[in-house]
């Protein structure tokens, strides 16, 4: 079976990303508005300044899921990835 890896785009400026078990949970003003299984994701792109829980960052780093933060207008702020595997000196 072929594994399709998807990217989660969070475009709401007031959204906060958290971890519940093996799920990414999107909160907006302390209300849950979405839930996605972590094993289906290759990357998460967040537009806005609210942030992500440290538990979700750690889980994404362990599973090699990239987190990318952009301003509400789309300007790049930061990218977080997991450990590099293999020979990095090449």
Language-model regions: role of each:
Residues 1-90:
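N-terminal intrinsically disordered, cationic/polar leader segments
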């Amino acid at each position: 079976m072929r594994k399709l890896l998807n990217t989660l785009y969070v475009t709401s400026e007031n959204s906060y990303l958290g971890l519940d078990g093996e799920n990414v949970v999107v909160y907006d003003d302390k209300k849950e508005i979405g839930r996605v299984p972590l094993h289906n994701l290759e990357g998460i792109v967040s537009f806005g300044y609210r942030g992500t829980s440290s538990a979700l960052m750690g889980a994404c780093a362990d599973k090699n899921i990239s987190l990318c933060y952009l301003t509400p207008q789309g300007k790049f702020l930061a990218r977080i990835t997991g450990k590099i595997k293999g020979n990095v000196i090449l």
